[in-house]
Every structure is written in structure tokens, then in C-alpha cells.
């Protein structure tokens, strides 16, 4: 018969192409696919490729008006997940023309926007993305870079120290500023607004900005060191967010902060551009990440969110600790720490990295470690993460029995002792506790902290683990 032949056909006929050779300009994705019973893995992988690119559930006559071969996503490989029944890694290649330049928002809308509710799948997780260099070059990326930040702050050869002010909600602006001053005076480099401190009735943003600026200038004058406080510019509208960043710049402070997932990628990229143009560092908090990345079989791994943040822009990003109260397995965590900091990262499945990633000189991001860490963790943190990290002790500073400033002193002394010992060639993994004990002999503040936290443990198994073959 004459005319157009409609009807439903299997996705794999069009979108499963195991013979396809990926191009340097393709965006590559690794999905963990759990098909519904009876759905072959090839069909499930092809369905993901189709529904996240050009496909729909039926053949449509307008398919004939374009070159689907040029624009379609392709599932080019399927492999079973070791040790898991009915789970597969599906590799999908997307042509670069499907994505708007310089837009993380558009990239995610395409790749993960719709397909996760697809009925043929029981669950779906985006494990990793390979961002091609041609696409990276359309992004500004982080406002400054690790070396530029060190030059701005005049701090070299050690991790930076921070502290989140607690209680996170309820303090007046003046008392909040006082807590900031005590911590900075004691020896910290930074203090931090909590992620949910925006502009509430008990403390409006402008009052907080003013008292925090006063605190850090007073601490700078007394210590002779450059200090910063992460002023949270996150707001209900982009215009209000930029207004807060402008006020921070007018106060002359070095750094502002944004909650990039709750605030959204469009807002975050706008703020990153403002920060580069106006010499502000940008601290990024990942509030809401566990809603997206916590489940092992569904959602999106944090390494993808970390790559997206590096494209969108931020000078610091929270990235798990390996020790402390927030989950993070060592190899996996170090994998996405490298993705934040380094210029070139090789494929390494033992660390969860599915693709080689070349950042072509896009500035790096300082990973921030926080959550249930204290002075006894300092040797491990210094050894695991090296110099290019921010170590953030909230309760581990403010919970000191003598107060905020002594808590800050204890952390700074512990850090300096660990860095000195490491530079002398001592093994922090073996001698860490001894190094801290030695330092505490001439620092009563550190001795009190050691006594206070000697029994604190967070003994839970990590949720985010590597796949291992069943024995």
C-alpha cells in the first residue's frame, strides 16, 4: 500500500550497534541497566540510547525529514555486572550535535532527563560520562583554579583548613560573626555557611555578610594571614543570587558559596561566570546529592555530578571523606577526587572510572572533605588527599571542650605536625597517632581535643562500593 508504515518496532533494530566505532567527539555514557523480566539486555540498552536521544515509542513520519543515522544515540556495548543478577553496563555514544554548547543543563536534560522512568527498565543508573574535548572547550569551567587560589590566599604546601559554623540554624547575625572570628583567629583558613543558611527570619543575608566580613578582617589583622568565609549566595531567584554575590564583592571578601544541585546548573554557571569576572572564589556544596547518587542501581553516580560541576564551575566541591560520618569508599572517592583536580585521568575500573577523561587545561577544583572528622583523622586525611584539598572540621572544631578558637588551634597544630612529619619522610599511615601525640605535648589545645575525641568512631559500611565477582 502507498503511504507511511506506522507501528511499534524493537529499539535494538535501530539503536543497538555493536559494530559502531566511537568518535573522539562523541559523548560516551556508561549506564547500569536492570531490565524488566523478559526484556533482553540488548533491547534495554538500545531503549536507553533511543529514549535519551532521537527515539520515541513508535516510528513517526517525520523521521524521514532528517538523518537519524547522524543524530541518534547508539548502544555500542553491553556487559554483565560481575556478582549481580540481571544487571548490565550499557555503553551509549551520543553525537555532539545533540547538545547545546556550554550548557550542563541541556546535557543532563538529554542524557538523564526522561529515560529513568522508562517502563522496560526496573532501574537505571548513570555510572560515568566521557566528555569530549570539543565539548569541554565550550565551557568556562571553574572561576579560578587551584594554583590561582593558593596565590590569592598566599597559602602553599599544605591542605587548607575550614569549619562549618554550628548550630547551622538559629544564631543571630552578630553571634554568628563572633563564632566566625573565633575560628579564624585560632588558625583556620576558612569558615563556612551551612548549606541551608540563606536568608531566614532569624538572620537575614545582608546582616550575616556584614558581621562575617567584620570577623574575617579582624582575624586577618590579628594573625597576618588571609582569611575567608564562604558566604552562601544561594537564593530563590538567579537575580537575588547575583545581588548577594555583588554585595560580597563590594565588601572585598575573597569567596562566596553556592548549593549547586538545589540551586540548579543554570544558576551555578551564571554565578561561576560572575565570580571569574569579579575575582571571587566559589565554594560549592552538594546538598541533595545523595537523593541522586545513593542507590547503587538507580540514579546517577557522584563522579558524574563532579564532572558536571567542573564544567559548570566551582573552585571547591564537597567530595566525601573516606573517614568520618559520610559514606565514601576509598578507591571510588579518590577516583572522583582525581576527576576534580587533575588534567588527565586514565580509565581505571578498579576506581570506578569507565572512560579516560582529558580536561584539556580546564581549571581544577579543590575537593572538600567534611563530615564527622576530628584531629585523630588528620594523618589519614593528609596522607590520602595530599596538599590540594580543604579539610573541614565542623563539630571537630566547635565541639572542643574549651571553645571555638582552641578547637581551631588544635586542628591547625595537628595539620602542621602531619605535614612536617610527611615532609621528613615519616609514614603517616603507620605513625599517625604517634605524630599527633607528640604534637599534643606542647599544645594543650590539641591535647584536650585528643582526649575529647579519642573514642569517637563512625563504624558503618560504605554504601558506594565497587562491583566484585561473586566467589
UniProtKB/Swiss-Prot annotation:
Keywords: Calvin cycle, Carbon dioxide fixation, Chloroplast, Disulfide bond, Lyase, Magnesium, Metal-binding, Methylation, Monooxygenase, Oxidoreductase, Photorespiration, Photosynthesis, Plastid
PTM annotation (N6,N6,N6-trimethyllysine): residues: 5
Any Gene Ontology CC annotation: chloroplast
Cofactor: Mg(2+)
One Pfam family here: RuBisCO_large_N
GO biological-process terms attached to the record: photorespiration; reductive pentose-phosphate cycle
Chief location category: plastid
Positions where N6-carboxylysine occurs in the chain: 192
EC number, as in UniProt: 4.1.1.39
Active-site feature positions: 166 (proton acceptor), 285 (proton acceptor)
InterPro entries the UniProt entry points to: RuBisCO, RuBisCo_large_chain_AS, RuBisCO_lsu_C, RuBisCO_lsu_C_sf, RuBisCO_lsu_fd_N, RuBisCO_lsu_N_sf, RuBisCO_lsuI
SUPFAM superfamilies with a match to the protein in the record: RuBisCo, C-terminal domain, RuBisCO, large subunit, small (N-terminal) domain
Record keyword Iron present: no
Cofactor: binding comment: Binds 1 Mg(2+) ion per subunit.
Modifications the protein undergoes after translation, according to the UniProt entry: The disulfide bond which can form in the large chain dimeric partners within the hexadecamer appears to be associated with oxidative stress and protein turnover.
Positions of Mg(2+) binding: 192, 194-195
Superkingdom, natural source: Eukaryota
Residues carrying the site annotation Transition state stabilizer: 325
Positions of substrate binding: 114, 164, 168, 286, 318, 370
Subcellular location: Plastid, Chloroplast
GO molecular function, one term: magnesium ion binding
Note: The basic functional RuBisCO is composed of a large chain homodimer in a 'head-to-tail' conformation. In form I RuBisCO this homodimer is arranged in a barrel-like tetramer with the small subunits forming a tetrameric 'cap' on each end of the 'barrel'.
Quaternary organization: Heterohexadecamer of 8 large chains and 8 small chains; disulfide-linked. The disulfide link is formed within the large subunit homodimers.
Family: Belongs to the RuBisCO large chain family. Type I subfamily.
Alphabetical list of PANTHER family matching this protein: RIBULOSE BISPHOSPHATE CARBOXYLASE, RIBULOSE BISPHOSPHATE CARBOXYLASE LARGE CHAIN
Protein's name in the database: Ribulose bisphosphate carboxylase large chain
Native organism: Chiococca alba (West Indian milkberry)
Source organism phylogeny: Eukaryota, Viridiplantae, Streptophyta, Embryophyta, Tracheophyta
